């Protein structure tokens, strides 16, 4: 079989960049002084026996972050950013993720093997510690996983002389592995970032700085007598099996190589079931990047891997790989500013890159990546190791690494209500995703714009829309709650108090109703909207003009409008989940308090600088607006937006207290009488709602409620209620709702947290 020159035969329009990617990142947990953390793996991160994204590697303090499969390098980094965010906010607030591959100053005695449930995995780690030493195990890095795209492989297969797709894929991945090991020095030269070891790491003096201790024989490598041939897949499989049989290796995974075949549980299965993808294991952590690897690196490596496929495989594989290993060792232990040695043939690599880009018509971005590679080949100061040199102080990078770790820690805790990389999604969905990752649930975003998620654990699958719309709700329930008239009728039939009023489908009908409500306190609101849109509240009798304006505002939001009696009292939002009240909020209407110096418009602008305020429900509090409704409210109180408000004077900009219209949230879950919580839960149950927001007006919360004497009125039930307002409150402790949603959906995971 020949697999050389296959890329060259493809049509220029072939999907050359099609691939699947995954990233694994190892990082040590340290304290704020840069010393190893001696705390256990965080219990909030679910059980390590099944967690798909956050594991421990060798040491108890060595976290391993694993992305799901991504269809692009950008998405892989996005996954890693989110998982890093979860990990960074799940460890103690006094702990950080170390930003270098080489550990801080350590001694062998303080390195604790990961306390895993699996007996063999514990035994295996103790075996490695005894055989290779513990300090080497604390070296961390990045593993770059890539599977060539299905359509790309099929196109290559059609150009080949093969009839067996599995044999073809094996040959293709074997060639890529061979050339990767042959040119491994390119990765070490460009991206090596382990120039020094902290004092005491090595038992003997080692010249430094270098490009990468981790990628040299001073890093984690097998004993010298372990030599595995990549000349054929059969040779590879048989060699490792023989070493295990002889007792030189304890398991297949003990064989360490810069590249590993992946996709089967045992190596021999590769022969008949095939290689699925390759794992490239020799990337140092980039401390200049919060997640340890840059977008440019991801894309440059992808291009280099394709160039390695473009190049012919070596004729004498074992000899070529031995030469490649020797060259890599030389470059890894060279000073970061030392030019490439003469035996490092860069011309064939840059030529392959140029031809690849030209043949497939890749654009300016990829042409720029090729130029960066060429420039770095010509000027070693542009390599990653060289960029670290100015930060070495007293033969140490610890201060630099600690500063970076602190900066990344602070970033993780900035806007801590959001999931990094997914900020454009609705906030409750971000919070649910954060908790799903933390608990160890698999996730897939089916439709980002529609906030539609797939979550699963083993064979158990749940679909979630907008954070709490699930299979637990009957289809008709949200439809009923979206219709305020239907909601009122169902609640009234069940014996619960609701406000009196009427429904209108035209402005003329509503205006004709004015004589009946003239002189009364009323509420005008759309029939079927959420988030408090289009609602006007008149605590004083409305003039005909203001009433007409309120009707017009409501009709802008819906084709039907309700005019109801105004119920005096304080409005509270009860969050009901599966028949139980989980949180109660007092919501204060959008308001400003005067200082005698600034106009109302300026006070609104000042209040909007609060970092908790944002737009489109992506922050816990919403930006306060000065639209028609707010200006109408001001007019009713005798003010205009450009009036200076007296010191201490509070004016409301809304009658309704929805957080979505600029209100403030106050958690009163622990202080309100439990009878109201039970009553609200009963109302939700009468609607058949699983997750529901119940809005009650309570004149005097000190009086206990009952169904016979409720001492309250239900003004609205909300399907898909916002959860973030209950967690990140303007005042009070806040109640975490999204973990309870997940516990209800996946009780088997909730009971297996360790």
Language model feature labels by segment:
Residues 8-10, 105-106, 116-134, 138, ...:
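Loop-rich catalytic cores of soluble enzymes, especially ATP-dependent carboxylate-amine ligases
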Residues 247-259, 301-304, 308, 553, ...:
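A long amphipathic alpha-helix within ATP-dependent nucleotide-binding catalytic cores
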Residues 1-129, 136-138, 175:
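Terminal catalytic/cofactor-binding subdomain
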Residues 97-102, 317-323, 561-565, 572, ...:
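A short glycine-rich, hydrophobically flanked beta-strand micro-motif that places a catalytic Asp/Glu
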Residues 415-480, 486-489, 508:
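ATP-binding N-terminal substructure of ATP-dependent carboxylate-amine bond-forming enzymes
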Residues 1-37, 41-54, 323, 327-438, ...:
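Sequence termini and other peripheral, non-core segments
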Residues 454, 463-469, 473-624, 673-677:
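Active-site nucleotide/adenylate-binding loops and adjacent lid/helix of ATP-dependent enzymes
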Residues 634, 658-671, 685-689, 698-754:
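C-terminal active-site "lid" helix and adjoining low-complexity regulatory extension at the edge
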